Amino acid sequence: MTQLDRSVAPAIRQLEHFSILQPELHRMKNGMPLYVLSAGNEDVIRFDLLVRSGQLDQSQPLQAVFTNRMLREGTVRMTSGEIAERLDYYGAWLDLSSSVNCGFVTLYTLTKHLDRTMEIVAGLVKESVFPEEQFRIICDINRQQFLVNNQRVDVLARKQLNRSLFGTSHPLGRYAELEDYERIQVEALKDFYHRHYHSGNCSMYVSGKVTPEVVRCIERHWGEAPWGNCTAEKVERTWDIVKDARKRVHVEKEDALQSSLRMGGFSLDRKHPDYLKLRVLVTLFGGYFGSRLMSNIREDKGYTYGIGAGLVSYPGTSLLVVSTEAANEYMESVITEVYHEMDRLRQDKVPAEELEMVRNYMLGDMCRSYEGAFSLSDAWIFIETAGLKPDFFDASLAAIREVTSDELLSLAQRYFCKENLIEVVAGKKPSGSCKSKKTIFERN
């Protein structure tokens, strides 16, 4: 028996081949698209209904997310208790969520119970009644969660950064406040439901061990005839971005034990030709444990337990965001070091060894992200909601493999603009030497 030499690191092998299973499109009789991803050997199915309307389509805060959340609270045939009991009996799990531009209904179920569980889920979407009593309970629960979250400095900093970048009249900069939980009425949810939850505004994904009978079952419940208010027209809306002129904004939280930092500015849209290679640069800068920010600010200086940078994408734009939490006395030093690492990438080429390490990390991350049938659903739902072409994953792979140190230097010089970043610090008001900074304070 050969003994393993643990003093020698295992050899790193190049990823020779990587491909993502393409979904097969089935067009239902009522025109709804069903994307089938047949993979896996277990008799378990994941079903996703994607509603192409979200927070960008609402007329007031909380309307989209509460409409989605209330689907499981009662239909014309079942109460919320009966819905929960039936799903539990069949061993199914239901998840409801809402994003900037979409709502999601996700069901995990055993294949042998698919017909029964699909009947329940179809009833939730097609026959919701939005009972007033359940609505008030949901409001109270979410109001309490809002109050708890509003004590967290990371939440305060994240919200303020979007307010500063987009403006409070833009839906991406407008967050629900305490009074919005009092103002929202069930009639607003019914209005959103009738305008957006219909067969002409939805698509479906099914993954797992998908058989022809699974497809027929889905068509029976969803695709035989149009459902909902299919005559409702979706109004495309636009908003002006009103960026805060201030460089530094401080959100005061007097009892905070530490401060939260968010630095951010507008960056490239996912469809920009430089976007995929910029992702490599941002990963190297602050997107993994061995990044420049982690190596300097965590490992070398010890200012924080963790710091990261990433591209946060929204419809039509994205943000370059740096985030961390640290003791109040270290915050100025952290900001200084962030800019220092940006300058290094703008001035010096990335060493070949470091670039190779980032390549291997990103390629490995892609393999982990898309190795299972259910994660493939996430991948292709992402493609639809982001409005990307099906070759996005192949293009991502090519960008990671082909980007050079010269290209990264050029990208840093063009897109790492310190002047465009807004600094948001949530925590105690700084004292001493920090007061010399021209910092404007926002009281939470």
Model-derived segments and spans:
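N- or domain-start disorder-to-order transition segments that initiate the globular core
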Residues: 2-45
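Phosphate-proximal small/polar/acidic motifs at interfaces that engage nucleotide phosphates
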Residues: 294-295
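Residues that act as N-cap/strand-start positions at coil-to-secondary-structure junctions
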Residues: 19-20, 88, 245
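Active-site SXXK
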Residues: 62-73
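Charge-rich, well-structured scaffold segments of protease-associated domains
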Residues: 1-8, 27, 82-233, 250, ...
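N-terminal cap/recognition module
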Residues: 55-57, 71
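His/Glu-based metal-binding/catalytic segments typifying zinc-dependent metallopeptidases
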Residues: 32-53, 60-61, 201, 229-291
